[in-house]
Amino acid sequence: MKAVIILGLVLLSVTVQGKIFERCELARTLKRLGLDGYRGISLANWVCLAKWESNYNTQATNYNPGDQSTDYGIFQINSHYWCNNGKTPGAVNACHISCNALLQDNIADAVTCAKRVVSDPQGIRAWVAWRNHCQNRDVSQYVQGCGV
């Protein structure tokens, strides 16, 4: 019985960690999910965004005390506007998705929501990390050697 409990705890700790993508693995995944060139945004810009928002970590979260919202997942999608965490006051949930879905190792839901974010007039500029680290920079290094 102790062995079953210990095994359960070990598996739980592995699950909680989530997936941390390798750079090229993420580039290939984002390309397969249709982000390369989506709304005119290069694959390199998407990978740069993910690097600076979450360091390629699907389980990344960041609480924002000002509006009591939280950013979720590989793209750090915010609960005030885009997803529902059941806690953020006045949440919009424009992606019509649970914020927990943005923390999955399978990032298809996160990509779908990111596509919704960039369909707004602000586009990819909605992400502060993209503006601070990727905008008007040579981002080709983020897909270099990835064969994409």
UniProtKB/Swiss-Prot annotation:
EC class:
hydrolase
A cellular-component GO term for this protein: extracellular space
Annotated SMART domains: LYZ1 (SM00263)
Q: Which residues cross the membrane?
A: none
> One Pfam family this chain carries?
Lys
Keyword list, A-Z: Antimicrobial, Bacteriolytic enzyme, Disulfide bond, Glycosidase, Hydrolase, Milk protein, Secreted, Signal
Q: Which reaction does it catalyse?
A: Hydrolysis of (1->4)-beta-linkages between N-acetylmuramic acid and N-acetyl-D-glucosamine residues in a peptidoglycan and between N-acetyl-D-glucosamine residues in chitodextrins
Q: List the disulfide bonds.
A: 24-146, 48-134, 83-99, 95-113
Recorded E.C. number(s)?
Answer: 3.2.1.17
Chief localization class?
A: secreted
Where found in the cell?
Secreted
Q: Which GO terms describe its molecular function?
A: identical protein binding; lysozyme activity
Which InterPro entries does the UniProt record give? Answer: Glyco_hydro_22, Glyco_hydro_22_CS, Glyco_hydro_22_lys, Lysozyme-like_dom_sf
Q: Where is the signal peptide?
A: 1-18
Biological processes, Gene Ontology terms: defense response to Gram-negative bacterium; defense response to Gram-positive bacterium; killing of cells of another organism
The C-type lysozyme domain is annotated at 19-148
Which residues constitute the catalytic centre?
A: 53, 71
Q: Which residues form a coiled coil?
A: none
Q: Per the similarity annotation, which family is this?
A: Belongs to the glycosyl hydrolase 22 family.
User: What is the recorded function of this protein according to its Swiss-Prot or TrEMBL entry?
Assistant: Lysozymes have primarily a bacteriolytic function; those in tissues and body fluids are associated with the monocyte-macrophage system and enhance the activity of immunoagents.
Q: What is this protein called?
A: Lysozyme C
Q: Which organism is it from?
A: Macaca mulatta (Rhesus macaque)
